[in-house]
């Protein structure tokens, strides 16, 4: 794996750590703060611009007790100052006291700005008939 691909994969991992920690502060550091960025959560409407995206994360974090990710099937491609990551989010979350396991296919697009990779696009789509792989 090339150096840029490694840095992008590390930033992608940090995105999921911020999500697991329900940390808007960590999430803020990972996103480009402009009006033309996009976020699509599974089953939600399109959010455009950092302020709307930030509010969507606050809503998710305030309504989530616990969430854990195991990321698999990761593909990283770098095209100059833009990178695309496609991965499977193997999610374990707590809903009404019950553990729920689900899968989401995600596309995360990053732009390199001042040697830092920032999210400019996140799209998650639920996997129908999800079967959790044998992972720990």
Located regions from the model:
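A beta-strand edge to alpha-helix "cap/lid" segment located at domain peripheries
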Residues: 2-32, 36-136
